[in-house]
Amino acid sequence: MELVIISGRSGSGKSVALRALEDVGYYCVDNLPFPLIAELASFLLASDCSAVVSLDIRNFPENLTRIDELLHQLSQLTINTKMIFLDCESATLIRRYSDSRRLHPLSNQDLSLASAIELENTLLDPLRQQADYLIDTTHSSPHELAANLRHILRGSTEKELNIVFESFGFKYGLSADADYVFDVRFLPNPHWHAELRAMTGLEQPVIDFLERQTEVHNFIYQTRNYLETWLPMLEKNNRSYLTIAFGCTGGKHRSVFITEQLAKYFQSRGKNVKIRHRSLEKYHKKT
């Protein structure tokens, strides 16, 4: 359980940082009023969860000694606190604001954009000095910033990919959220064996039947190799979920068995795997 404070110059990537850390499981709060940060820390301590809060010029305390007081208060709570400051060259910030056409938070003080950026830099310097980590985002893409933050906080630059293996029946329609769809209707069908018809791909007689089929083994082997070849690229693509769907006619036998086999294989390789049987859920509701 920890509290991460993200601060830095406006336009340096704080919003990107919050989205990236929310994707890896942190509870994120944007621009929480400064007096409430200690209350949030107490809540986290009681609930045993981790959070990220942004602190910028809009909620910066006028009395700078309050920052020291807050950090001391957090240390008394025995909460693991990290402060990360995002910096960026002024010329790059000017270009980013020109491209986005957004107003700088200090622009309402009758300052030019360049003057507002330099004033903010001066005001934030005490916070920069307190930071545990300083990240210069001048030449960083959003993906590179996200990877840098994951490395600092999780020890790994890669975002954990959640892989969903799901089965479905074509007669109920295609899986709407699937990234990959494999049609297994060409495989031997247990439905045509009266003693197996009422069963599902989770039951041993159906499993035994499908395991005896050479075509089934070949399909599993070749599909497994295909996925193993391209999963590393997908994991580097900064995505949170990958849904791989297998469809047979009714979503009751073949697709269920294939889904289970491949899900268990990748689970045994340390992947974060979930299994979903869409049409099987319909079947159980009917019965």
Swiss-Prot record:
GO terms for molecular function: ATP binding; GTP binding. InterPro entries: P-loop_NTPase, RapZ-like, RapZ-like_N, RapZ_C. ATP binds at G8, R9, S10, G11, S12, G13, K14, S15. GTP binds at D56, I57, R58, N59. Keywords: ATP-binding, GTP-binding, Nucleotide-binding. HAMAP family: RapZ_like. Displays ATPase and GTPase activities. Belongs to the RapZ-like family. This is Nucleotide-binding protein HD_0584.
